[in-house]
């Protein structure tokens, strides 16, 4: 019944999206679906933010090489008022001004830095310090009680010379994700006499829409980015003929050189080269129109008197992902001809027409997004009001279950839009950035942020969206082997705090080891490889790709550890990311080591390989320094009991074993779970957006639904911008994904080897359904509850095998057959298998 209903909804949406796109048709109200929307337009204060309205000032040496590198985005309307669309490769933000549409544009591989700067390949790759020999001296200092010496030796030897800021070295080798420019479509209109304005992002169809009326005319603009065709589609129309008088122009990335040329009678092509590393990029535009005239002159497309205009836009760079880079080749990551790829994409897209492009886009997107549906107390009517007003009301204490559902599904939307197979993973801002440079280089931050991006992927039925992350991990292995050997004398591979698209695995120049010393980056990333297998049970993937990544990461973890004279294994030196001193055994590092070794053991058993190595992993696990409880009853963060109960630091690293790991649990380690709860109570319920997202997951793992719900509310109230983007500040996308993952954790968990139903259901969510979520073991679930208790769960077994299910203290095991659905109802205190 549910699948039939969803199919009808899909068909209705397609019909609604297509049939209404004719002149004089009724305007569709997209706000009635699952949508984020505004009722006031953005003002067009200036053209591209980096020019500050004066492009003549940014010539030659005055180019803004570090513009945007601030904690506060200088373009606040972009950060909190724009609507993001994307297909995993191309991203755009819709501003929705009346006078001119401003669209910021991104292509995920447009990066500065790498081996192809003027410094050459050796300048980029030959940056690891040969520090492994210092480890013995550091560890002896710990034995002697000389912690200052141990810390000094670590600071001086476990960094590099690579700067993290573009202004700090020339050429800038680490690099950063950078804008591909902006598009402007001048309309000749003004806000005078404008009414009924709406700027909408429909999550149901991944379609952005701007609607308004002026002088008796209903105007509409539609925007989407097709994954099948890799093209952005923008349409301008009205309910009266001849109303489209448009001038389309493009402002390229300001730290590049290039040339705009006509591409036929109705198209433009810009071919550019980044100043920093000579990365080539191409932006290709084509316009079609019904009625009126089109003039292609001076790098602009001018349309007069048209009934409807459609712009197609595509882009690419010369970047080619490389799992086996030649460290002597400056062009190791060059291998694509963007002129050819964009020409082929444009040819394919332009042959289809708007309706066919939208239908294909919708079917592709809906096949992913519609897998999961969340209902929260839906019998409660909800007022249809703009999203900023919803947030304002929510902050003032008004309950809004629609907003809570919307935020959950927005996280899934963002993951689909920023991470699709065949490209790179979502970065600190997903795929969206509006400036030359940005906070933390808009990079791949490996001490929680990129990992958090993928917490909701498999559990919310988007496992394939994890594949870009796995490909990214594969790019780190060969460079990471050099880093592991140079700094730790270790086998295997690892990474450090920050990654780019050019295989960077080395620590940066800073001597602040609280953040720059992060050898667990590699093992933490590798746990996602096992998670992908555990959800999908794709044994072919594990054998051909996954196992080697996991095994080599486990080898690094073992070699990194210090076997103390008493036979205990500990991590020295180690840190708790971004917090506290250099230590001889932080809880965080030990928890990550436990996780990757358990993953490696399980993977080797699945494949029936490496019994000898498996035995070593098991022996190290048995002798790894255990969790410790401190004087306040808290789980200790460091090897010494120095935790401060007034410390509200955003990172809760020592609870890694609780979440995202699985070595702490109220079910298996109840005393340590109590100690974990004390940590969370000490840390408080505030902090940055992503931190609240993490704490939400941790409270859910403690089975405290009401406290988890409080964190979810705090995330929405205090860590969310008007367009529902997460903010640190500034905008950081990881909190969105952490929030979505946390809601799933409240309603279903499977990390402990069994399916736990409604483990952290809050009192506020009395009735509801969560359909389509996935559990480890390759099970898909439809869960319903009523009056605060489980009603029924449908379990689709996609792989077969035993399925253990827990609700409250009731446990049952179902022997499943691949492809069959099993229904369990909660009746009279028992889980009853329905026939």
Regions found by a protein language model. Give the residues of each.
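Acidic/histidine-rich catalytic neighborhood
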Residues: 552-606
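Aromatic-residue-lined binding/catalytic grooves and analogous aromatic/hydrophobic interfacial grooves
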Residues: 26-513, 531, 551, 564, ...
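Extracellular/periplasmic, surface-exposed regions of secreted and cell-surface proteins
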Residues: 507-523, 527, 535, 554
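Well-ordered alpha-helical segments within folded domains of soluble proteins
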Residues: 447-458, 519-530, 588-598, 653-662, ...
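Bacterial Sec-dependent N-terminal signal peptides
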Residues: 1-26
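Non-catalytic carbohydrate-binding regions of carbohydrate-active enzymes
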Residues: 530-537, 541, 545, 553-563, ...
């Amino acid at each position: 019944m549910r699948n039939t209903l969803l199919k009808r909804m899909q068909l209705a949406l397609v019909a609604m999206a297509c049939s209404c796109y004719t002149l004089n048709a009724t305007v569709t109200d997209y706000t009635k679906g699952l949508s984020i929307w505004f009722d006031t337009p953005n003002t067009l204060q200036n053209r591209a933010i980096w020019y500050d309205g004066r492009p003549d000032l940014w010539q030659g040496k005055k180019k803004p090489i570090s513009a945007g590198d601030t904690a506060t985005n200088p373009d606040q309307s972009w950060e909190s008022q724009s609507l993001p669309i994307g297909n995993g490769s191309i991203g755009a933000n819709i501003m929705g001004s009346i006078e001119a549409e401003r669209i910021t544009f991104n292509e995920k591989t447009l990066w500065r830095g790498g081996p192809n700067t003027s410094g050459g390949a050796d300048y980029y790759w030959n940056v690891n310090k040969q520090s492994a020999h210092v480890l013995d001296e550091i560890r002896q200092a710990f034995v002697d009680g000389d912690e200052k010496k141990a810390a000094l030796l670590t600071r001086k030897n476990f960094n590099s010379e690579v700067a993290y800021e573009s202004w700090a070295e020339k050429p800038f080798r680490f690099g950063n994700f950078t804008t591909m420019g902006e598009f402007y479509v001048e309309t000749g209109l003004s806000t005078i006499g404008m009414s009924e304005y709406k700027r909408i992002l429909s999550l149901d169809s991944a379609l952005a829409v701007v609607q308004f009326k002026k002088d008796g005319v209903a105007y509409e603009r539609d925007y989407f980015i097709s994954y099948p065709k890799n093209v952005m589609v923008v349409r301008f129309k009205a309910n009266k003929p001849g109303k489209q008088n448009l001038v389309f122009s493009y402002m390229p990335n300001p730290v590049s050189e290039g040339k705009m040329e006509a591409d036929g009678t109705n198209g433009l092509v810009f071919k550019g080269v980044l100043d920093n590393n000579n990365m080539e990029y191409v932006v290709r535009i084509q316009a079609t129109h019904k009625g009126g005239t089109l003039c292609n002159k001076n790098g602009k497309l001018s349309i007069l008197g048209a009934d409807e205009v459609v712009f197609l836009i595509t882009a690419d760079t010369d970047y080619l992902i490389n799992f086996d880079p030649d460290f002597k080749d400056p062009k190791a990551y060059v291998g694509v001809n963007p002129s050819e790829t964009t020409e082929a994409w444009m040819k394919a897209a332009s042959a289809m027409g708007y309706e066919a492009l939208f239908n294909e886009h919708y079917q592709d997107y809906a096949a992913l997004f519609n897998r999961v549906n969340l209902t929260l107390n839906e019998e409660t009517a909800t007022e249809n009001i703009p999203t900023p007003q919803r947030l304002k009301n929510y902050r003032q204490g008004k309950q809004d279950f629609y907003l809570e559902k919307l935020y959950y599904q927005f996280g899934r939307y963002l993951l689909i839009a920023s991470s699709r197979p065949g490209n790179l993973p979502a970065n600190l801002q997903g795929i969206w950035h509006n400036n030359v440079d940005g906070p933390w280089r808009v990079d791949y931050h490996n001490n929680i942020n990129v990992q958090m991006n993928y917490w909701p992927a498999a559990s919310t039925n988007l496992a394939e969206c994890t594949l870009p992350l796995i490909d990214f991990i594969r790019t780190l292995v060969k460079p990471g082997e050099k880093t592991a050997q140079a700094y730790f004398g270790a086998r295997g591979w690892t990474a450090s705090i920050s990654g780019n698209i050019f295989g960077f695995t080395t620590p940066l120049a800073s001597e602040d080891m609280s953040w720059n010393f992060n050898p667990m980056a590699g093992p933490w990333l590798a746990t996602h490889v096992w998670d992908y297998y555990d959800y999908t049970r794709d044994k072919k993937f594990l054998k051909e790709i996954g196992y080697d990544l996991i095994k080599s990461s486990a080898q690094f973890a073992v070699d990194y550890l210090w076997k103390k004279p008493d036979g205990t294994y500990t991590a020295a030196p180690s840190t708790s990311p971004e917090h506290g001193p250099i230590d001889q055994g932080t809880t965080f590092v030990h928890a990550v080591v436990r996780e990757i070794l358990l993953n490696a053991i399980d993977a080797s058993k699945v494949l029936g390989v490496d019994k000898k190595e498996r035995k070593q992993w098991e022996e190290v696990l048995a002798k790894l320094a255990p969790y410790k409880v401190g004087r306040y009853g808290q789980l200790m963060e460091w090897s010494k009991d120095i935790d401060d109960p007034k410390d509200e630091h955003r990172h809760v690293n020592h609870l890694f074993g609780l979440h995202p790991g699985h070595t702490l649990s109220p079910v298996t380690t109840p005393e340590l779970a109590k100690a974990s709860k004390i940590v969370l109570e000490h840390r408080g319920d505030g902090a940055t957006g992503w931190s609240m997202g993490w704490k939400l997951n941790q409270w859910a793992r403690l089975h405290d639904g009401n406290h988890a719900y409080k964190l979810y509310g705090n995330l929405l109230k205090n860590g969310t911008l008007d367009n529902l983007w997460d903010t640190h500040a500034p905008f950081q996308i990881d909190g969105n994904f952490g929030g979505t993952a946390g809601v799933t954790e409240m309603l279903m968990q499977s990390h402990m080897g069994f399916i736990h139903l409604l483990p952290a259901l809050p009192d506020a969510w009395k009735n509801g359904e969560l359909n389509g979520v996935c559990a480890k073991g390759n099970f898909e679930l439809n869960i319903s509850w009523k009056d605060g208790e489980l009603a029924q769960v449908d379990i689709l077994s996609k792989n077969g095998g035993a399925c253990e299910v827990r609700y409250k203290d009731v446990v049952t095991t179902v022997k499943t057959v691949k492809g069959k659905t099993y229904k369990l109802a909660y009746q009279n205190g028992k889980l009853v298998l329905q026939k």
